[in-house]
């Protein structure tokens, strides 16, 4: 540090899904490679994808951005995290911790309470770093939300950030999106926009002319990068499971032919072309932890929401959930409970992670009204009792002796994290009758059925551990560092010369 406040670069988008998160990640690594001390920042994130850091939870995007910046992830990098539980209800995480009072408060009433906390976190990062790379949210031109803005132009003006405005040209209307967003900003806000970025372009870039020049004549803002479509950049999209789909495995599933089997059981996890299905219920959480599977050669990963899509899969994953009982009810309404049970009955491998583990058991008991009582799927002889307290911690653990489909994980150590309400234990009556849940990790972190094809664990991040991927698939996948360097190389290649340096130049 030079002793002066950091320069700040901010990535704004014309819409959600424009490419803000990955571009912010790329900028973090680009500036870090120059020997600068870099930190990411996003004032408010709405996502059920979260990571555990010192002090609590932050959005997964900011966690990976910190790693790209070669910085220790910190709750100040995402001071406000909203985790949707229902269509009109979110759990509010402030500086890493659940804030029950804010969770009950109407959305428009929160900004006055949280802005001082956001500003303080940002000011501290500015004082401790050379560059802070800031990510906006949605669009900065939502005029109905402007009075309560705490994440876009209010942040940009607070720091005097050099702002890039990025748009997804693949969806069409890119120039209108850019001009319309710019036009709806105040004059002082427009002065902060230093460049437009056309993301996800396919085809001959010369065909864009004279669009960029005309846009610059109308706004005074140059188009500083045209980024070609890049499906395989290695990072998940933040805003939704089906936005991730084109980047996963070898493609997205299509509906099976009429009369196809709903399940087939028993193949090895090292089958030549394993097909892995993740059930995408409405309140799915931490979906990004499955992203590494798409880098495993030959693996076909698909997201499913109907029984027919489970035809021919080798194994089924029930991921985490922000509303376990509600998502379990949805799963039953779709008929997926019967399809998963049929797959398991035929010997097919089933994995439940966190909320997915809880669903696999016999019952979910909720004495405090957190998630609601519900019968489980009955594929693991365990019972989960929800608790008011929330377990949030990073863990190092090791699998014990596993049988059947998951035997390759025996003795494998892994690093992961817990984010859950509730504790899971064997069903006493079933154990007495000989139906035993086998604890395969210390402290009740993982359970397996006697047959050996159904496994449930509380630890998130299993597929991000190289030892697990090696054990299950015999595969070595690119390291995160290699992914981050690839992102930095990409923007260095496609931005106009000198632009990235000019963004952090002293005025």
From Swiss-Prot:
Record flagged with keyword Cytoplasm: no
Active site: 354 (nucleophile), 460
One Pfam family it belongs to: CbiA
SUPFAM superfamilies assigned: Class I glutamine amidotransferase-like (SSF52317), P-loop containing nucleoside triphosphate hydrolases (SSF52540)
Keyword Acyltransferase tagged: no
Function summary: Catalyzes amidations at positions B, D, E, and G on adenosylcobyrinic A,C-diamide. NH(2) groups are provided by glutamine, and one molecule of ATP is hydrogenolyzed for each amidation.
Protein's name in the database: Cobyric acid synthase
Gene (UniProt): cobQ
